[in-house]
């Protein structure tokens, strides 16, 4: 069975086009009507053209956005029914896709034949999405849907924490986060509210004092400019959440800071090559690992964890005071232009009105 969806395609940086998309609706699938989406920096990189030309040529035209919620219009999956409010899990592994793909023992977010919404595969900027039923998670009636809309962003920070065998040790009881933006904030909140890392053992380094003040209810904070990283003892794990032009300095400060046989998790995205102090990586016996995206497990874990009122209050600092109401390509362009021009700390939320 085929269904038609209205969509806004990004056809080139800065330009959207209203179009229609056809989807096959198969057994095990659900039709979701996206109601709200949240803008990610990855979306902005496509919109502003801040991606390599070959990536833009390969992936556009495309419907943006991978952070979204919606309501089920129809279901061929036994666990979901019409009217359910759901969070959309954007990574569709090959085992859930139509087609003949080689089996893999890789995690879903590292499956080479997976597709990811808003990254070479049409995302949440459409009125009807057909997704596997295993790619959604129900939103409880008691949960604020604006908090639920943060699930994807939270999941990206939670996934690498879940992968670690141990976050701390007896002799190195501390965890550090580099980055005072949303990714660092969500990594720190997960470490405190889900994993129970206490304030005195959770250290956040940043460059802007006003941003660091938002962390002070659950973490110890320091500015990077005047901190003596080499003299600090007690950190076993560091999460690098800076990205961009700050990746190199953050990684090397983390190498200076961390105890021997510690672990550094790289989460910040940069388009540039960075120089790393490999001599001290070797001398200290450090482990560096990368992390990208997440799995459905993190979404389920988060929806359950969002029941914690203190966690909810911490997350609400990222929720904007107003939505952008999207009736047309002009509305969408304004929302993206504003977001690109004013890269504030709070998220940009879009509310769809399809005619």
Put a short name on every predicted segment.
Residues 38, 76, 91, 242-246, ...:
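Short glycine-/small-residue-rich Rossmann-like dinucleotide-binding loops
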Residues 90, 267-271, 292-294:
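Short strand-turn motif at the edge of the Rossmann-like AdoMet-binding core
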Residues 93-174:
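NAD(P)H dinucleotide-binding glycine-rich loop of Rossmann-like/cofactor-binding domains
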Residues 166-172, 194-198, 212-287:
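Glycine-rich cofactor phosphate-binding loops and adjacent beta1-alpha1 units
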């Amino acid at each position: 069975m085929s269904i038609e969806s209205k969509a806004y395609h990004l056809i080139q940086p800065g330009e959207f086009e209203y179009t229609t998309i056809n989807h096959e609706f198969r057994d095990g699938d659900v039709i979701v009507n996206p109601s709200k989406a949240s803008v990610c920096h990855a979306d902005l990189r496509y919109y502003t053209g801040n991606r390599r030309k070959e990536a833009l040529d390969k992936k556009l035209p495309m419907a943006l956005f991978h952070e979204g919620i919606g309501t089920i219009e129809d279901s061929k999956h036994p666990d979901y029914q019409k009217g359910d409010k759901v969070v959309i899990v954007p990574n569709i592994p090959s085992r859930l896709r139509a087609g003949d793909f080689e089996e893999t023992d890789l995690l879903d977010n590292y499956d080479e034949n997976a597709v990811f919404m808003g990254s070479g595969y049409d995302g949440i900027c459409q009125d009807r999405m057909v997704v596997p039923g295993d790619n959604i998670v129900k939103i409880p009636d008691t949960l604020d849907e604006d908090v639920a809309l943060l699930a994807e962003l939270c999941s990206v920070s939670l996934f690498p924490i879940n992968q670690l065998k141990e976050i701390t040790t007896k002799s190195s009881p501390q965890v550090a986060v580099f980055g005072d933006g949303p990714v660092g904030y969500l990594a720190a909140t997960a470490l405190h509210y889900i994993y129970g890392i206490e304030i005195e053992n959770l250290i956040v380094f940043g460059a802007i004092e006003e941003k660091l003040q938002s962390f002070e209810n659950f973490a110890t904070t320091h500015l990077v400019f005047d901190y003596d990283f080499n003299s600090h003892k007690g950190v076993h794990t560091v999460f690098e959440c800076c990205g961009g032009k700050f990746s190199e300095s953050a990684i090397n400060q983390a190498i200076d800071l961390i105890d021997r046989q510690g672990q550094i998790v790289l989460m910040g995205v940069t388009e540039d090559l960075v120089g790393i102090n490999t001599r001290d990586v070797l001398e200290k016996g450090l482990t560096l690992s990368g992390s990208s995206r997440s799995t459905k497990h993190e979404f389920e874990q988060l929806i359950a964890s969002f029941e914690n009122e203190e966690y909810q209050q911490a997350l609400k600092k990222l929720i904007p005071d107003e939505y952008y109401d999207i009736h047309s390509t002009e509305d969408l362009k304004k929302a993206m232009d504003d977001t690109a021009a004013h890269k504030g700390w709070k998220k940009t939320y879009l509310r769809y009105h399809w005619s």
